[in-house]
Each structure stands twice: as structure tokens, then as C-alpha cells.
Amino acid sequence: METVEIRSKSLLIQWLTVESNSLLSWQLHVKRKSIKFDIYHKKNDTSSLLDGSNKNTDRSILHTKRQHTHEAGIKKLSAAGLELFYQGERCMSEKPSEGSVYIENGGLYAFVFDNTFSKTKPKTVTFLLTAQPYNGPRIPNASVHGSPKQIISGTLLKKRRKKGQGYARRYFTLNMVEGTISYYANENSSVMRGKIPLSIAVISVAAETHEINVDSGVELWNLRAHTHQDWLRWCNALEKAKNSQTSSKLVVDERTQESSSNQLVSIYSRLRECLDIAQLYRTSRIKSASSHNFSVPEIRIQLPGDAKENKETRTSVEITAAENAQAAVTLRKVTRQLGSLLHELECFIQHHEYTKERTAQSSPSSRMSMDSNFEQHWYDAEDYESTTSQLNHYSESGAHAADATKSSVAHNEKVEDISDSDIPIMKTSSNSTSLDADRDSDTSSISDTSSNSSAPHEQLNATSLASTVDESSRSPPLPEVESNKENDIKRKQPFHDLMDSSSPDDSSFANAKSDEEVQKPSVSKNIADGAVISIPKPLTPKPSDSNSLYPLPHSKVGRRKNIPAITVPPPSILSILRKNIGKDISSIPAPVVSNEPCNLLQRCAEDLEYSNMLDKANECDDDIKIFYVAAFAVSNFSNMRHKERSVRKVFSPLLGETFELVREDRNYRFLAEKVCHRPLIIACHAESRNWIWNHSPKPIQKFWGKSVELNTLGPVTIKLACGTEFSFMKPACFLKNVAIGEKYVEPYDHMEIVDETTGDKAVIRFKSGGMFSGRSEDVLVTVIRSNGEEDPKCLQGKWTSHLDFVNTDEGNVIERIWEVGPLVDKPEDHCGMTVFAAQMNEITDLEKDKLPPTDTRLRPDQRYRENNDLDHAEPLKLELEQKQRERRKEMEEKDIKWEPRWFVPSVAGDDEDEDGSGPIWQLKKENNYWESRENSTWSSCPKLW
């Protein structure tokens, strides 16, 4: 072997005479960074050589000081009579490169080492070139490598890190052996800018836009190919590289996996059978008009053994369902125990399926190959036609769950009710087998949703199961708002907060009712019976002062400090999300158990928790105002500091739903209304005597495989009473560890606050975390004055706790200008809420008999959810969704456009802004909300529930 050094900005040529019908082979290893090589053929009709002094040598060096070194070197090769015979690849220092190529026509060949892309660094290469006769089949001009090509390289468009900067051309290399993809600024650059192992990444593609998305969980690359052929080439290469990495990591015997999987399915079948009997017993009691005995066979349930001791435990539960209190108590206890076991089993199955799927994710049998020319059709749940059916009850001779496993599923997910333990069960059944497949005509209170799965026992989809075994056929009155009763059952199942990942109208659950539910009292009657939520009666109109902030000022009112404990863990909907990679997931349906008792309108109001920052900004010196406004902007993210807040999502409002918030202790009033359904747009307005705040958020969320990107389009505008105006756009946030691990939300990159009056600008930078560092909380705020100079003062701290006013010249802290407020007691059991958020859904003396019928506090399904009454929350949620679909369908038939009641768009109308956020919505000045509230005239409000 031979070792040479290729200087920077140079080409080194190794000459070799090769006989006809030979095989030219090479082995080379670069000791530092990388080198590129090509093979050229010397034309016979050209007598000139590169350099007269090198005419009798076997090696030549080309060196040029021109700016475009590579192009100059290629021109010299061409001028010397050399034509490209074989285009090589970039060889990295980590792996040696070897290969061979068939030479049909003999002659003089040049093996060219290319280091023109390196400006200062020479490269040392050890290589071996051999030419041997080849007696195999003649394949002219074809490469006969002993192994597949190790490096795939080319140019792709990569979305820039900063928001709104579009795509940039980058040079990518895919190492097929290592299973890694990396990129450089351009083809001639030797500085690697990023590298992702494919073994830990989730890859999604879109044929229509030629997109390739690579999500490692830490960073996300949004790539785009120039042509369809280029897109297919990269998809093929990525699929092969990922398959090779996946197959190399299979260390578990296949038979052991299959045996373990079958054992889990068997355990689940027997557990499911007992739960079905509980449901059968409950429905039988309700259905039977006359009292009779109902016998239930003995059920034997074998629980999974300890992983270390490998011991099996048998539990025999004998249930005799008779019309007596003792049977009901026993059945309830058994159901609660089985529910807890099902939850643990679900977590184990989910992890097992996740590991198993990683090995089969790229196989043709489990999904469509990436290199095929296909189109993915993503449906909006609002457009998905829900199937409504009247279903009968379980018969006494219903088939057992063991028999049900043999039949294929002919319908989608089922939402069932079972005991008062509120057990969340996940079940995906579209192409998979189901334990309830043969009962689709005998099940009560069942709702369908769509989900595609190819695994025979796919991880369970989001379903809420909650009812009481001995409950009567009549719905109980709505629980009081102030109820703070805590349940002893405390379980956690990770989920994620998508801000608005599911619209009530965007659910594909069917609005199915049993015969008993039809006879239940209406929702409005239940609300009246509860004597807590009531629609006010019209009062005598009163004149309104346009300059007042009615109903402020107001005497101080008492507010609660917490909400009822949320005892039912949220289900995991990874099986749904993973089928929507790269798409907006705001339309994905989810059961009510996955919601926290908070609405998106109320979440918007949480931005004003630290409104005192704006009060101080109005009163302080002009050069300090922007620091307080920046602190206010940072405080908007602090409500997500407890990680429990990231495992559930908020309720999405109905079209026309409103929410008011009057804080007499903070001297401001707030109003929000959902003004558009598609795209989802919320109009918000708040005002006090010191400032006016306006925001029209347009939330968009996308799932990238391991993380969820949360974007809130629409500018925030702030006008202080002193005349200064500010505006800013919220940065993107990422929900990390969606697939597995502890979930958390963190803001990404930076945001800018502009002083529209002076031209000053505050730049808020959120520090990025590393691969193993977890959530990053550090934040730095610097101010650039209108003259371009940076202010020596800045803000430093954490968006989860505090911000300090710091003088960088002196290196001391001037004062702490912002600190977070308190969380509720035991936040892990109360959705991780702040005390401010817990007070949102409460009806105080300020709101009593004053709210419009569209206010979120009067929404019955959310109220039931707050009080853990999932039995009534789920059907009410489905009913509200169905009614909204009917209203919108009727408006479309009559060609009627929805007009918001309290907000109007700005002068721009319906025109899209540059960022796609749409028009800015302003509060109406005439016949506005606060005048109607003062006069209690709500006749123009739509009926939503």
C-alpha cells in the first residue's frame, strides 16, 4: 500500500496502465476528514500531458490559486485529454473505501484524488490500486463492486432553523454502512453541520411535495428534493439504510418474541372477558323490566409473572351476579382491580409493540415502500362521516371474548362504559382482530372512530370506559362547580398537550345512544337541577358608558385554589399520531378522558396571568418599557413548566363559543371567541386602564414521529396608555418524547419584540438543549436600540421560574422583575395547573347570572370532565360535535357564511398575512359584548348546547 498527501485546493493524479477486459480495484483510507476521488480515461488522440516535467512519472499534482479551484482543476483535466470514466464518492475518515470497476478497453487511466474543496487542510491518504484480468461476463461500462455503494450523496433543500426563512441548498451524505445521514453547507465544504443516526430517527415522506422529514427526537430536518426522481433515489437509499440498521440490532430470538406476544394477547383476552361480563351484567339490569337472576360463569384470570423470579400467579374470581347489594359490591371491586391490571398490561404491550414495530417499520408487508409513487390522503375528522346507529344491549347468551378473537373486525373503535372506576382502555381495530368483533350488533353506547393498523394486537386506541355497576337509568344532576373531591386512584399514562389537537367538531365518534339514554333527561334540565349553571333572564336595559371598563371596578370576590383531582390517567394515542406524521394533527379525534378541564379559549386567557408586567411597563421610563414587555412575553410559556401539563390536551371550542375573564384584583377584562373553524382562529381582546392587548391566534400542530411542533400564528399587539405600542410573534414550541419517555414542552429558537414607536427591538433567545440534557429552560433577553447599538442591560433567567434585570457592564443583578406564580397543591394530580388556570372554569359572583349562553363555563361536557364524571362527559361531547356538524351542513346548503358575534376582521379582511396568520380581529365597538352583558341581552347568541 502507498501513502500520499494531497495539499489543500489540489488534485493528485495516480496514473495506471490497464489491459483490456480487466478489473480495476481500489482500497483507500483517509486519515483526516474526507477526500473525493474519480477515475478518468486518457484519450488516445491527445498527445499533450498535464506537465512536461511529469511526462515520465506516474503521478501528477494540479494546484491552482483561483477562487473556483475545483472547476479550474476539472478544466485542466479535460484540456489534457482526460474524460470522466467513473464518478467516485466522498470517502470519510471513519470508514475505509473499497470497490472495483470493469475496464473493457485498455489504456492509460488516471485515479484522481480531489481535495480542492479544502481551503487550508491537507489530506493524507493510504491506498492500493490493482488491475487484474477479468474472465467473467462482459458488462461494458458497468461497476462490479464487491459490496453495495457505501456513500450516497447529493444536494437537497433543507428548511432553515429560523422561522420564516424558507429552504436552503445543502449537501447531504448517507452512509449506508453506519446508517447515518449528515450534511454540509455545499459540496466543497469539509465542515459537517449535522449528523443523525437513522436507527433512532423517524422518517416520513410526501410524494406530492417531494418532502423527506427526519426526526431524531432532538432535532428535526425538513428536506425537499429538486425532482421526483431525486426524491425516489433518496427514499430508496434511506429505506435500505434504515432496514440494514434495524436488522443488525435484532438480538431477541423471533420465536421468543412470538411466544411472548401470544402470551400477552391471551392474558388480555381473559382480562377483557371479565370486563365484558361486568358490562353484560350492568346492561342486563337496566334492560330487564322484571326482576330475575342472571348467572355469570366462573372466570379464571392468570396474571403476568414477575420478570425476575419468573413466577406465575393465579387468581380465581367467582362472580355470581344476583339482584343483591353484595353482588354489586363484589363486581365493582373485581372490575376496579382488573382495570388497574389492564392499565399496567397496556403499558407493557405498548412498549412491546413499539420495539417490535421498529424492526418491521420499513418492511413492505407493514407499510407502503417509500420508493413507490403513492399519494397519502389525510382526512379531516370533521369531514369523516360518522356512523350513527341504534344498538341493542348485550344478550344473556352473548359470546365470550375468547371466541371473539377469531373473527375480524368489521367496524372501528368502540367506546364502552364499565363500572365507576373510570378505566382508560386503548384499542385500535381496523384491520386487526378485536375481542368485541362479534358484538357489533349487541353493544350499547358504542361510538366508532377510524384507525388503521396492521398488527394483530396493535396497541390499544384511546377509549374512555366509565360507568357505575349499580347506577340507575336516570342521569344524576350536574355536580357543583366548587366540588373538589379527590379520588384515591392515582395513575399516570403519558399523553401530550397539543393545544388544539382535537376539535369537538373534528371527532369521528358516532353519536350513538341506547334506548335508556333516549329516555334520560336533557342536558339543560340536568344543569337546572344542579342549580349552579343557569342562563340569566333579560333585565331592564341600562345605558353603557363607552369609556368605562364595565363591570370594573368591582369588590373583591373569592376564588378557588384548585380543581377536583384528575384521577383517570390519559390514554396514549401514539397509534393514531404515527399515521399522521408531517401533517396538521388538529383534526385527530380523541376521547374526553384525554382532555384536561380547560378550554383553548381559557388557555389563551392564561397569557394574561402576569398582566402586572404591562402595568409596570406603562409607568416606567421609556428605555425600560421594552424589558417589561419582554418579561411579559416570556411569562406566556410559564404555565407549561410542570410536565404533567404536557400529557393532556385542552378542550377545543365550538364555533361561536366565547369566554370572558374579569379580574377585579388585576383590573382588566378579557374576551375570546372562536371566529373560524377551518383554519382554527381564536379572536382575543383584553383591556385595562393602563394597556390594551390583542391577539388572534391560529394554532397549527404537526407530528414528526418523536416530537410535536406547536406553532401559534398571529401577532400579539400591545398598546400602553402612555402611547407606546409593541408587537411580537410567538415562537414555535416542541413537545418532546411523544413516543416514549417523559414528555415536556419547550420553546424553540428565539422571538423578537418590536417597539413600533421608537424602533427598538428586544431579542429573546431560548437556549437549545442537547440530546441528553432534557428540557432547556435558560433564556436571555437583549435589546437593540433603533440606532443599532445593543443596550448594556439585559434580562437573564429561566422561563420556568424568574427573570433578572442585569447590567452586563458591571456584571451585577439590578433587580428581579418577574417571578412565577404558585401551582396548585399536588399539581401531579391536578394536570399540573397553576392557581390562575384552576380559577378559569369557576363561576364567581362576578359571572353569576351574567354570562351569555355561549360561555365556556356553561359547557356541560367540560363541566362533567372537571368533576370526573366521564360517563356523562363522553356522550355529551359527541352530541355537541354532531350538532355542530349539522349546523355547518345546513349553512353550506343555504350558502350562509358564518359571522362572529363579537369580533370583526381588520381592514385587511380575509386576506392572508405574509406569515399566513390571516386578518387581525378587533372587538366590535357598537352592540359589543360588554354592552350586552351590562343589559343582559343575549338574544343574538347561537345555541351551542
UniProtKB/Swiss-Prot annotation:
Recorded hits in Gene3D superfamilies, A to Z, give: 2.40.160.120, 3.30.70.3490, GOLD domain, Pleckstrin-homology domain (PH domain)/Phosphotyrosine-binding domain (PTB)
Domain GOLD: from-to ranges: 1-131
Q: Which GO terms describe its molecular function?
A: oxysterol binding; sterol binding; sterol transfer activity
Compartment annotation:
Cytoplasm
Q: Does the keyword Manganese apply?
A: no
Biological process terms in GO annotation: endocytosis; ER to Golgi ceramide transport; exocytosis; intermembrane lipid transfer; maintenance of cell polarity; piecemeal microautophagy of the nucleus; sterol transport
Question: Spans of biased composition, class Polar residues?
Answer: 460-470
Q: Where is the composition biased (Basic and acidic residues)?
A: 482-499
From what superkingdom does this record's organism come? Eukaryota
Give residues where Phosphoserine occurs.
288, 419, 421, 503
Annotated PH domain residues: 149-243
Low complexity: bias regions: 443-454
Q: Which UniProt keywords apply?
A: Cytoplasm, Lipid transport, Lipid-binding, Phosphoprotein, Transport
The cellular component terms of Gene Ontology attached to this UniProt record, alphabetical and capped at eight, are: cortical endoplasmic reticulum; cytosol; perinuclear endoplasmic reticulum; plasma membrane
Region of interest called Disordered, as start-end residue ranges on this chain: 396-555, 846-894
| Listed PANTHER family | OXYSTEROL-BINDING PROTEIN HOMOLOG 3, OXYSTEROL-BINDING PROTEIN-RELATED
Q: Which family does it belong to?
A: Belongs to the OSBP family.
Its name, as the record gives it, is Oxysterol-binding protein homolog C23H4.01c
Q: Please tell me the species this chain comes from.
A: Schizosaccharomyces pombe (strain 972 / ATCC 24843) (Fission yeast)
Q: What is the lineage of its organism?
A: Eukaryota, Fungi, Dikarya, Ascomycota, Taphrinomycotina
